[in-house]
């Protein structure tokens, strides 16, 4: 029988050390929940202990006091797992997920200061789904992909505007293939989605796309030196590159990864060589060394993976 945990730890990279988080007043053990960092607290919410035990509860963890405070359940979204959550700077937005029957397209905004919930509109919201991904752009939440309420892999999405409580569909032109268990990062101007799983088109994927919300357009990510196909991996944005690592692939769990540069630099232009200037006592002028600006190149060292195992579902 599976064990569901309500334990955790804080890792300090400066000292390479771990400190356990308190279990006093901690939420019940669970999986497939979400967590966001709110500037001074971690907020966890939702998840499941079994398909018959879903949660719409959560907690705020303060690392300075090593203490937990429960989140309100008044007006909280319905219990779910495999949803997404983003932090806006003042609120946590949770959306989508599975309610035990199918994917849903409902969500809520949680304010940790007032401990209050406000429902997100369902008008023009994307179809219900779980296993999707979401990013926060600074003004909008973008959700994309996942498994829809009919059980099909999705390549649709939507942009949720916090200020107007409204949805706008993302373009379906040049969009990546449908998938779940992928990753998504926000670069400051684009959302990059990569890899994932689609059982109808060969299983594990190593394709992706860059979505520009200002243009409502997609651009495919390069396949040159791309890491092996995978799902359930991780991805972060460094400020200039996306780094992906790990995941499930063929024939099993992977410990490989790669860095992807979304935009190349300018083409290097050598500085012209100075010509010697004759004088009464001929002395050649030193030749200037050509300088060039290197063009960043995304590179990865793929390593074959192991068994094709679809991403687990709680």
What kind of region is each of these model predictions?
Residues 265-313:
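Ser/Thr-rich, Proline-interspersed low-complexity disordered segments
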Residues 1-268:
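Kelch-like beta-propeller repeat domains
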């Amino acid at each position: 029988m599976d064990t569901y945990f309500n334990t955790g730890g804080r890792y300090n990279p400066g000292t390479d050390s771990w400190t356990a988080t308190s279990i006093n007043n901690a939420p019940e053990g669970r999986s497939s929940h979400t967590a966001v960092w709110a500037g001074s607290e971690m907020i966890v919410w939702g998840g499941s202990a079994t398909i018959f035990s879903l949660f719409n509860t959560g907690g705020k963890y303060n690392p300075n006091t090593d203490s937990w405070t429960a989140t309100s359940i008044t007006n909280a979204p319905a219990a779910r797992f495999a949803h997404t959550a983003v932090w806006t700077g003042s609120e946590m937005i949770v959306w989508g997920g599975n309610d035990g029957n199918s994917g849903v397209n409902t969500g809520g905004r949680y304010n940790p200061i007032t401990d209050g919930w406000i429902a997100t509109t369902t008008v023009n919201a994307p179809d219900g789904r779980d296993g999707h991904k979401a990013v926060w752009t600074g003004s909008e939440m973008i959700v994309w992909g996942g498994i829809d309420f009919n059980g099909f892999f999705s390549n649709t999405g939507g942009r949720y505007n916090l200020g107007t409580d409204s949805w706008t569909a993302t373009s379906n032109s040049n969009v990546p293939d449908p998938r779940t268990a992928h990753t998504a990062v926000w670069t400051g101007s684009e959302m990059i989605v990569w890899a994932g799983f689609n059982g109808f088109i060969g299983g594990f994927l190593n394709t992706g796309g860059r979505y520009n919300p200002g243009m409502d357009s997609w651009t495919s990510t390069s396949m040159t030196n791309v890491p092996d196909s995978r799902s359930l991996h991780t991805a972060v944005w460094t400020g200039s590159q996306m780094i992906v690592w790990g995941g499930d692939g063929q024939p099993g769990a992977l410990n490989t990864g790669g860095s992807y540069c979304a935009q190349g630099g300018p083409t290097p232009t050598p500085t012209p060589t100075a010509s010697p200037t004759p004088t009464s006592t001929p002395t050649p002028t030193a030749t200037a060394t050509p300088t060039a600006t290197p063009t960043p190149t995304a590179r990865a060292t793929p390593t074959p993976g192991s068994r094709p195992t679809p991403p687990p579902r709680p």
